[in-house]
């Protein structure tokens, strides 16, 4: 999982990527290609 300062590029990397908020952090999850998982500080 990458830690990024901006998730704008991360959510457009793959069409299955979704932005979710968990425990006060912003995550990008991608079910079909988990390589693209990311979180924001």
Curated annotation (Swiss-Prot):
UniProt GO MF annotations: structural constituent of ribosome
InterPro entries per UniProt: Ribosomal_bL36, Ribosomal_bL36_sp, Ribosomal_L36_bact
Superkingdom in the source lineage: Bacteria
A GO term from the CC aspect: ribosome
Similarity-based family: Belongs to the bacterial ribosomal protein bL36 family.
NCBIfam families, sorted: PRK00831.1, rpmJ_bact
Protein name: Large ribosomal subunit protein bL36
Keyword hit for Ribonucleoprotein: yes
Listed SUPFAM superfamilies: Ribosomal protein L36
Keyword list, A-Z: Ribonucleoprotein, Ribosomal protein
One annotated GO biological process: translation
PROSITE patterns listed in its UniProt record: RIBOSOMAL_L36
Keyword check for Lipid metabolism: no
Organism: Xanthomonas campestris pv. campestris (strain ATCC 33913 / DSM 3586 / NCPPB 528 / LMG 568 / P 25)
UniProt xrefs under Pfam families: Ribosomal_L36
